[in-house]
């Protein structure tokens, strides 16, 4: 339930407290982190340590005041790169997508981070289109230029000639955003590329960071289960995925990584409160669409997973990899699994999206380049 800090005058009071607390603590942190032994991780730089702590404070703040998301159907500065997608035909939405009668498919905003593809035939055969779902714990984030500039630039630089398409799915922090709202929007946006723009699935790379990776896994699972209405993409790239929502906030809070990673337990609690399906739907936390670690996807497409060595969710990510590897076939007689993994030593959660803020740009660049090499090895053989 919302607390007193989520409504006025409580929000203003708490905001003033947060600003004062942060400003007073900043000089002390600057002195403290001059000594490597006092940093969250002794392998981190001063910049990484200070940025991590300040970002963690911010995460606690937004989860406490429950910051309201901006509108998702307004073009804004993206102008002609922004598109509004109407829901697809009703037969596209089945089973889990209709578990809550109160949540129906709606219009979806999306942003092209290259020259927009606006009509069938404009896409060139062989041109990769990264269908990227942003992170933010299902309560924050967007696919706009400001938030996606670093991620999209890495993908475009590492894969010249490609395109990046970012849907603005409904957030659980807004009315009507509880599960399966974001899931419906992801299906709508993916169907738009395949059916409206007629981009061949073999040219679409499904990608997502953090909660966006969780959503990408759900989208692939749905396409795999419903090939008659939604074909699978060429590959799946997962960046610091959130593969298990069974784990309790208390358990996460007790992990040593909690005091190193920037993910605030309050943010996880906010997500659980606003995102998880209503009890009346009969969809539990252990459902594979909610917690992918509970069942593999019987797919043949390549899956690549990146995570940081200091992530709070590292055990769950490793479990997801093991579960998925157990069902993956081998390459045409080669002894090489279709699940690629890449751990960034000592890194915190989601450096793909947050590197400019928390100081991991070179490591994020290396990770993207490795992902593209993996794709090339799988798709160009």
Task: Give each language-model segment a name.
Residues 137, 169-173, 243, 348:
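Alpha/beta-hydrolase active-site loop signature
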Residues 1-118:
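A glycine/proline-hinged amphipathic helix-loop "lid/cap" segment
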Residues 109-158:
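Short, surface-exposed "cap/lid" segments of acyl-processing enzymes
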Residues 208, 212, 216:
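Gly/Ala-rich beta-loop-alpha elbow adjacent to hydrolase catalytic centers
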Residues 147, 165-203, 360-362:
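Catalytic nucleophile-loop/oxyanion-hole region of alpha/beta-hydrolase
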Residues 113, 132-136, 207, 239, ...:
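Short hydrophobic segments within beta-strands
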Residues 7, 184, 196-205, 217-381:
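Alpha/beta hydrolase fold serine-hydrolase catalytic domain that processes acyl esters and thioesters
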Residues 82, 130, 164-166, 236, ...:
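Conserved beta-strand scaffold positions in the cores of enzyme catalytic domains, especially
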């Amino acid at each position: 339930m919302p607390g007193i800090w989520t409504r006025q005058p409580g929000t203003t009071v708490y905001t003033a407290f947060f600003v004062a607390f942060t400003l007073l603590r900043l000089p002390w942190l600057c002195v403290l982190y001059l000594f490597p032994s006092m940093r969250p991780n002794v392998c981190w730089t001063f910049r990484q340590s200070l940025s991590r702590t300040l970002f963690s404070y911010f995460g606690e703040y937004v989860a406490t005041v429950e910051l309201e998301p901006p509108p998702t159907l307004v073009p804004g500065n993206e102008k002609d790169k922004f598109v509004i997608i109407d829901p697809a035909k009703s037969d596209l939405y089945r089973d889990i997508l209709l578990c809550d009668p109160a949540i129906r498919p709606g219009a979806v905003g999306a942003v092209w981070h290259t020259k927009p593809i606006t009509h069938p035939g404009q896409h060139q055969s062989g041109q990769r289109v990264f269908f990227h779902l942003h992170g933010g714990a299902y309560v924050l984030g967007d696919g706009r230029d400001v938030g996606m500039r670093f991620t999209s630039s890495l993908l475009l630089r590492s894969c010249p000639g490609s395109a990046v398409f970012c849907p603005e799915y409904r957030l659980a922090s807004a009315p009507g955003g509880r599960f399966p709202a974001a899931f419906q929007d992801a299906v709508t946006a993916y169907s738009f590329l395949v059916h409206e723009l007629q981009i061949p699935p073999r040219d679409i790379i499904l990608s997502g960071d953090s909660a966006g990776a969780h959503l990408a896994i759900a989208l692939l699972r749905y396409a795999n289960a419903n090939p008659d209405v939604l074909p699978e993409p060429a590959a799946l790239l997962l960046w610091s995925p959130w593969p298990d929502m069974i784990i309790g906030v208390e358990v996460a809070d007790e992990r040593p990584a909690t005091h190193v990673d920037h993910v605030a337990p309050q943010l996880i609690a906010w997500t659980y409160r606003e995102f998880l399906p209503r009890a009346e739907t009969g969809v539990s936390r252990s459902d594979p669409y909610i917690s992918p670690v509970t069942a593999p996807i019987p797919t043949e497409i390549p899956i690549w997973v990146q995570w940081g060595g200091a992530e709070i969710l590292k055990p769950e990510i490793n479990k997801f990899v093991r579960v998925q590897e157990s069902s993956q076939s081998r390459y045409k007689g080669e002894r090489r699994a279709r699940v690629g993994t890449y751990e960034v030593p000592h890194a915190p959660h989601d450096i793909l999206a947050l590197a400019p803020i928390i100081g991991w740009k070179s490591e994020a660049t290396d990770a993207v380049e490795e992902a593209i090499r993996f794709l090339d090895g799988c798709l160009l053989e």
